[in-house]
């Protein structure tokens, strides 16, 4: 009975380790940017990042009408 419990606990720990590693990899890009994509002036695709509180240091506004769409 004790052996089955230990096997069950080890499998559960291994499962949690794998799930947490997959979750980190899936959210890595979102955590790096922490903003939403937006379209800069003169670009045909979403090349900028919309920041809630303005452009962070090292970034500049790339849309005349919206100061929160920024490019690095």
Curated annotation (Swiss-Prot):
GO terms for molecular function: toxin activity. Residues 22-32 form a propeptide. Its main location: secreted. The keyword Cytoplasm does not apply. Disulfide bonds join 38-69, 40-62, 55-70. InterPro entries: Myo_ane_neurotoxin_sf. One of its GO terms (cellular component) is nematocyst. Keywords: Cleavage on pair of basic residues, Disulfide bond, Nematocyst, Neurotoxin, Secreted, Signal, Toxin. It comes from the Eukaryota. Residues 1-21 form the signal peptide. The keyword Disulfide bond applies. It is found in: Secreted; Nematocyst. Transmembrane segments: none annotated. Belongs to the sea anemone sodium channel inhibitory toxin family. Type I subfamily. This is U-actitoxin-Avd1f.
């Amino acid at each position: 009975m004790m052996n089955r419990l230990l096997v069950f606990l080890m499998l559960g720990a291994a499962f949690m380790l794998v799930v947490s590693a997959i979750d980190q990899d899936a959210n890595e890009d979102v955590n790096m940017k922490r903003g939403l994509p937006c379209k800069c002036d003169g670009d045909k695709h979403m090349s900028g990042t919309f920041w809630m509180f303005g452009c962070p240091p090292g970034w500049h506004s790339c849309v005349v009408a919206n100061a929160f769409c920024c490019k690095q």
